[in-house]
Amino acid sequence: DGEILQMRVEDPLGEWKVSKKDARLMVKRTPDDRKGPFYRIYREGRFENFDGFRQEVAPSPYGLDLNRQYPYDWMPEHKQGGAGPFPLSEPETRAVVAFLTSRKNVTGVMTYHTFGGVLLRPYSNFPDTKMPNLDLAIYKALGKRGEEVLGVPCKSVFHDFRYDANEVIHGVFDDWCYDHLGTHAFTLELWSIAKKAGVKVTDFIAFYKDRSEKDDLKILKWQDRHLGGKGFVRWRRFKHPQIGKVELGGWRMLFTWSNPPPKYLAAECKKAMSFTFAHAAAGPRLRIRRFDCEDLGNGLAKVTLDLANEGYLPTNVSQLALDHKVVLPVEVVLDLPPRAELLIGKKKTEVGHLAGAASTACEDWVNSAFFSGTTKEQERRLEWLVRGRGRIGVVVKSERAGTVRSEAHAGRR
């Protein structure tokens, strides 16, 4: 029939039973259940090296996980399944790292996955207390905006998205982006059929490992109403060439659980991009608010530059970027007319980094009724004393906040 679904095979040792409430649904056998019929469930296909007795399930041909391949906290296969032989062993992951490390102006990263309906953030291997306070506050502020736009919760992987309570996940892309580049990276798990069906999911790992019959029935009925029943193939008898009588059927996983059904795809993409644009809009943005020359007489001019970061994020984007020395300070370069002389100040000046509006995110009292203001760390003023006349230019460069220019005229025209 052109589909790879599931096989259910009647077996007194089986772990599953047919639901009494809907014959399509398989439910787990209870510890004290002795009344069959019981079933085993397999992915549709043939058994490898079948000898008439053992029914060995073939290993997945897709054992490599690109999201366990990144250099941050990478671990070998015996410790982290899917990690591959060494970090960045695959051309795809190497290409991503080469792209990002060669572009110093990246201020944020979004990575799209399916499925689950949750927005994830670093770290995977550390609690929030290990993250610099400002970075954590920014992550929470951006995450809250994500919750508003996407309608899904934002969760720390370490605290809320672990497959095993005794293990952490290694070699993850968004961890690498944050720890190596100092950029705030999120992983969006797109689409949740459970949410569409009105099922409340609080534990995003446990729910998919083991959920109630009530929840499964609710999801099954949702696809009956909204997909015309096309998301599930009813079980039918089939003679398997190796083991004989089986039944074929089950969920069409690709466009029910794993991805949105086609008619829901556009809405899902629109939400995802809306948050991506909001995330991008939070980046730092340099602005020259004033650049002028004041004539002091005797061929002297006082040159003044007022510079500001009008973005939400600081020009360094994160504290970790500073700690790991992966971002250069903002640089101001003055361009003087021929024969002009600089008496006070430097032609090239490093001004450090400018805070963004996010500086308030770390304040203890951020409610406006109690807020008492902050220092003007979002702004810088530079002054020079110049002897000479003509056009004076200024260029302000930041790896992550852009480049801005202006000019003024010294002396009478």
Protein language model regions, located:
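Serine/threonine-rich low-complexity intrinsically disordered regions
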Residues: 6-11, 17, 29-44
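General N-terminal targeting signals
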Residues: 21, 83, 163, 202-205, ...
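A generic membrane alpha-helix/interface feature
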Residues: 19, 129-131, 327
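Metallocarboxypeptidase
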Residues: 27, 37-38, 43-296, 302, ...
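Acidic, glycine-anchored loop motifs typical of Ca2+
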Residues: 1-7, 12-18, 23-25, 52-54
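C-terminal beta-sandwich/jelly-roll accessory domains of carbohydrate-active enzymes
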Residues: 308-413
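Residues in and immediately flanking transmembrane alpha helices
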Residues: 14, 124-126, 317, 322
